[in-house]
Amino acid sequence: MPLHESGEDYLEAILVLHEQKGNVRSIDVAQHLGYSKPSVSRAMSILRSSGYITMERDGRILLTEAGKTAAESVYERHRFLTK
């Protein structure tokens, strides 16, 4: 399923937060992006059903291989554009 820009933003945030903190939860993504918790929960549901993330019972968000590949691609593109 193709990603929209907002989905890319969420995946990139998860990647960055995972590198900074290790464990990532929805509240971390909400704070990082400045979005409401309900908005993030909806986005996580879409990303999960699209196969980009999994969510553990304790609330941790993990990128799947497809999610990690997409997140790294977005991150590199943003780094290139900001240089």
Task: Outline where the language-model segments fall.
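A short, conserved structural fragment
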Residues: 48-58
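Basic, amphipathic "hinge/linker" alpha-helix immediately C-terminal to the N-terminal HTH DNA-binding motif
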Residues: 59-77
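Amphipathic alpha-helical dimerization/coiled-coil segments
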Residues: 79-83
